[in-house]
Amino acid sequence: MHNVIIESNLDNLLNNEYDGYQAFIYCRKGSCILTYNEGRHEMNGDSCAIILNKKFLKDIAPAPDLECEVIYIEESFLRQSEPRNPYIIQGMLALYSYPVIKLDKEGTKLCNALFQNFKLRIENTQHKFYDDILRTSIH
């Protein structure tokens, strides 16, 4: 499998082949209930979710009208890419409790731009600095 996988549905979110990947989900439209870390979390249009560890994800219940994009990033690749930040533990703990983030208008615009930019960069596999570009695009 690849370091980074982009999909436009949640079909593989519970797939064992994707163990070892973190999932970054951008919900464009519709809704989905995630049962994660003993809580039920609802994603709606213009929200995003970050699933740090899939073993805590017990169930997903997408509505029929759900439109989303998912970026799966292999954890080892992500670790090589992340900046060394002493506050990262606090952020990770918060995401285990509240994986869904409701976006305001500006946040929606930025999240959409980030996902589109990442998709453009991942398609350019022949670029001399492909891995470096992917790593810097993650953050």
Where are the model-predicted features located?
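N-terminal regulatory/effector-sensing and dimerization cores
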Residues: 2-94, 127, 131
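Amphipathic alpha-helical segments enriched in hydrophobic/aromatic residues interleaved with Lys/Arg
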Residues: 93-138
